[in-house]
């Protein structure tokens, strides 16, 4: 462990073996109570993602590849979890490969019944990312996650609240928002047009769209009746918008960016890697 002085405080730089790193990442990213096969796949995906990030420095000024947040993978400090460690040990060295290269195995919490492709982030499909396709997360009995709280959700946002948030999030004085138009759709919403009394604004890609409509000040109701306060990002970009007299009703599904593996979907099924990452295979890595 190395400690350096940063602009806003101390920076702790932790260098450790990948397998030890994973013993903290897996329980931070997926509940240890999940099916062992799902935990194993989480370990393989987290390992693959880590090796891909090791090809360059995410923080070159500190010679660090990643940080411990959701910007990369959550590396928390939970107490040792036997089942998570078992999953890491059982898959030791295994990674997801595509066309001879370690795949960038993105994952997220919950799907709405389908995933999306890298188009959601403005990246066109090519020979290197062909494993990140939009797939239906369903079987003979329907969508695997249909009974989970975040499978469907909705938010009734007062026009005044949304108008204030949009101004804060975009830094543009559009005034009162009169309409939200979905102008491009993937499976996820890829572009929206915000029409205000003082002007319009177009927002592209799922993360920027979720950020534009996110923020504190309203509530999100999950399909099980649970209500949670809004946060800096809309739960997902799988949504529709309805305009009422004084509210915008956003009806959505899933939680997270929607690219790659749905963690809750993985917990509900068997052949996981080949399902979410089309054309990819689990193999022993070279790292």
PLM-predicted stretches and their roles:
Residues 1-287:
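Conserved, single-site charged/polar hotspot
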């Amino acid at each position: 462990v190395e400690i350096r002085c940063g602009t806003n405080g101390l920076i702790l730089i932790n260098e450790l073996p990948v397998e030890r790193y994973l013993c903290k990442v897996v329980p931070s990213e997926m509940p240890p109570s999940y099916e062992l096969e799902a935990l194993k796949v989480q370990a393989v995906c987290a390992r693959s993602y880590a090796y891909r990030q090791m090809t360059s420095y995410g923080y070159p000024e500190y010679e660090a590849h990643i940080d411990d947040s959701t910007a990369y993978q959550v590396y928390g400090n939970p107490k040792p979890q036997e089942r998570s460690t078992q999953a890491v040990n059982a898959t030791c060295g295994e990674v997801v490969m595509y066309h001879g290269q370690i795949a960038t195995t993105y994952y997220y919490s919950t799907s709405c019944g389908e995933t999306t492709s890298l188009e959601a982030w403005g990246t066109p499909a090519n020979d290197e990312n062909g494993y990140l396709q939009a797939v239906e997360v369903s079987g003979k009995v329907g969508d695997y996650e249909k009974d989970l709280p975040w499978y469907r959700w909705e938010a009734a946002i007062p026009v005044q609240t949304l108008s204030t948030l949009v101004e804060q999030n975009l830094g543009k004085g559009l005034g009162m928002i009169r309409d939200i138009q979905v102008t491009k759709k993937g499976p996820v919403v890829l572009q929206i047009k915000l029409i205000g009394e003082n002007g319009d604004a177009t927002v592209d890609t799922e993360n920027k769209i979720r950020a534009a409509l996110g923020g504190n000040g309203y509530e999100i109701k999950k399909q099980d009746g649970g209500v949670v306060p809004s946060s800096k990002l809309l739960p997902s970009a799988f949504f529709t918008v309805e305009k009422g007299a004084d509210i915008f009703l956003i009806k959505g599904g899933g939680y997270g960016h929607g690219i790659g593996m749905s963690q809750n979907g993985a917990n509900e099924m068997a052949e996981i890697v080949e399902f979410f990452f089309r054309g990819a295979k689990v193999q022993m890595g070279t790292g």
